[in-house]
């Protein structure tokens, strides 16, 4: 969210920009968060379940480097093709960052402090476990989560109050993308409950066939199937709760999964993070980036149009990754 507006501004004089935003979603909004629990919600849920903070960096760096390298190579090929066409520059476009505007400066620097506070609150909720639980309408709510969420809301209001209006105006900030994504994901999370409950039922539920696929006849995990089952469901059900379902299907014991089950946990983690990019609804930032780009006048692919991009670019990478890492 910090980078998409500067990226759009840097490329606004170009004729072909859609591929830039699509690959931004692939790389930054998804694959870029594969190495720590702060990078993507599925890994954060794993952290809350007891997975060590640096476990993902130590066990997913090969898959992540492969993903980054191949995506950057494909992007370079597409971008170079458009450049060779020789018609990239749009005529008579006013420079959004003229040299006469004065020296380079950063407005709203207080938000760096608030951002550090956000990271601190997120880490706190995974490290501080006082054991205090509240029951709200039949749902267990942990004290550390209450403190985290209240702190995040307070920091959001602090940012609104402390950030100069000129900084938001300069970034063409508006609430429309946030409201659009909030409404859509509110609907997704309301309707996803029964589906997640059916998945949690395991071999006794309606998705028993899928659950049985991830283990062989001897009960041993099939890492390739964990990778694809987690990934495909993450693409359409949101990757965070899907990660948690398959984490528990694999045993739910973080200590065991980080040691003898490391390859299985790696398959689940990689699938949830990487395949969250397969659709706009696989990961909330995907839709946010799309909405921000459209608010700046860029025509983005439709839901199924975006899936054509992900199918052509991402799926071959996932197939290769299966043979290299998850056989």
Can you say where each PLM-predicted feature lies in the sequence?
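Intrinsically disordered, low-complexity non-transmembrane regions of multi-pass membrane transporters
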Residues: 78-115, 158-175, 299-300
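Transmembrane helical segments that form the transport core of multi-pass membrane transport proteins
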Residues: 115-245
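Alpha-helical transmembrane segments and their helix-start/interface "positive-inside/aromatic belt" motifs
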Residues: 17-23, 102-114, 172-186, 307-310
């Amino acid at each position: 969210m910090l980078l998409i507006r500067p990226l759009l501004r840097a490329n606004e004089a170009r004729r072909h920009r859609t591929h830039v935003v699509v690959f931004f979603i692939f790389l930054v909004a998804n694959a870029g968060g594969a190495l720590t629990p702060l990078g993507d919600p599925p890994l954060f849920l794993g952290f809350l379940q007891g997975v060590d903070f640096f476990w993902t960096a130590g066990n997913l760096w090969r898959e992540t480097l492969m993903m980054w390298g191949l995506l950057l190579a494909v992007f370079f090929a597409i971008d170079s093709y458009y450049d060779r066409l020789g018609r990239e520059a749009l005529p008579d476009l006013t420079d959004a960052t003229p040299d006469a505007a004065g020296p380079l400066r950063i407005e709203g620097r207080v938000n760096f402090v608030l951002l550090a506070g956000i990271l601190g609150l997120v880490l706190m909720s995974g490290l501080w476990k006082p054991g205090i639980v509240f029951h709200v309408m039949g749902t267990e709510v942990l004290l550390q989560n209450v403190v985290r969420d209240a702190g995040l809301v307070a920091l959001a209001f602090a940012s609104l109050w402390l950030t100069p209006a000129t900084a938001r105006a300069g970034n063409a900030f508006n609430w429309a993308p946030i409201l659009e994504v909030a409404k859509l994901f509110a609907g997704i999370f309301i309707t996803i409950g029964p589906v997640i409950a059916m998945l949690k039922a395991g071999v006794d539920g309606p998705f028993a066939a899928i659950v049985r696929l991830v283990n062989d006849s001897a009960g041993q995990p099939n890492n390739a199937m964990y990778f694809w089952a987690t990934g495909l469901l993450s693409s359409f059900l949101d990757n965070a709760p899907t990660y948690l379902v398959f984490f528990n299907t694999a045993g739910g014991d973080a200590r065991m999964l980080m040691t003898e089950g490391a390859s299985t946990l790696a398959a689940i983690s990689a699938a949830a993070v990487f395949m969250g990019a397969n659709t706009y609804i696989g990961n909330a930032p995907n839709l946010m980036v799309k909405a921000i780009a459209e608010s700046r006048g860029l025509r983005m692919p439709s839901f199924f149009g975006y899936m054509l991009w992900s199918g052509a670019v991402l799926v071959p990478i996932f197939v290769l990754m299966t043979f290299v890492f998850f056989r």
